């Protein structure tokens, strides 16, 4: 009997902040980046690094998307204070998270999910709508 591969043990990606299922990533409009991504209904943004080797670029892209495209603002955000993040191994063909190991895995894509933490002094607003 064949053992299941890591890919088959994956699970459909869900937002860790609201629990909703994440849509399939697609080409993001309004950005020159080729990295696919999308946005959750709660305002969290994610970008997929298909090679698993451009993590810094993917995280910066996700932060810029979360800031509405304001790259200057996104460069000064600090994890834990300004945003929450989740980095997970991802299979783009099956649209599944691949659990069971951490770190770089040759040929495995990575999904970078970011949600901004509202500042305590800011008025409570609804989720940021996706860019048009």
Predicted region positions:
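A composition-biased, non-transmembrane "mature-region" signal
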Residues: 4-6
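Cys/His-rich microdomains that often coordinate metals
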Residues: 19-24, 44-47
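Short cysteine-rich clusters marking metal-coordination/redox-active sites
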Residues: 15-19, 39-40
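Residue-level signal for mature regions of secreted extracellular proteins and peptides
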Residues: 8-11, 33-35
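Short metal-binding segments enriched for Cys and/or His
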Residues: 41-61, 67-72
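Long, contiguous alpha-helical scaffold regions
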Residues: 70-132
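Short linker/helix segments within small regulatory modules
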Residues: 26-37
């Amino acid at each position: 009997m064949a053992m299941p591969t890591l890919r088959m043990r994956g699970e459909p990606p869900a937002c860790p902040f609201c629990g909703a299922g994440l849509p399939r990533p697609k080409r993001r409009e309004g950005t020159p980046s080729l990295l696919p991504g999308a946005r959750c209904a709660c305002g969290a943004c994610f970008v997929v690094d298909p090679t698993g080797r451009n993590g810094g670029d993917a995280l910066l892209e996700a932060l810029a998307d979360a800031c509405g495209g304001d790259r200057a603002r996104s460069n000064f955000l600090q994890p834990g204070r300004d945003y929450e993040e989740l980095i997970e191994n991802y299979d783009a063909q099956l649209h599944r998270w691949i659990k069971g190991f951490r770190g770089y895995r040759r040929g495995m894509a990575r999904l970078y999910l970011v949600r901004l933490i509202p500042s305590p002094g800011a008025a409570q607003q609804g989720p940021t709508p996706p860019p048009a």
